[in-house]
Amino acid sequence: MAKRPKIQITLIERKGPVGCHRGHKVGDTYDFDTERGKLCPMACHVAFPYIDILRYGGSVPGQPEGTAVFCCPDVETINVFKIEKIED
């Protein structure tokens, strides 16, 4: 059985006027498999479909191969995250 690729999630931008209630800052990076508990649950909820698409061989239309960009659903914060598939 093939090994699953790693998934890295990085906060790349904040568009809202209010800081993140979870304390995330631009530049924070997380290994999804080992650090997902550190991620905001709302952001994780939005990230799950993209993670599954990338991890299992799919691609997200309009995004570079192996990546996806999404926003957290907090309208006052609007953190923008980048998901990257990392092949070992």
Where do the language-model regions lie?
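Short, structured beta-strand/loop micro-motifs enriched in basic residues and often containing a Trp
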Residues: 5-16
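Short, compositionally biased
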Residues: 41-58
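Short, compact, well-ordered microdomains
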Residues: 57-88
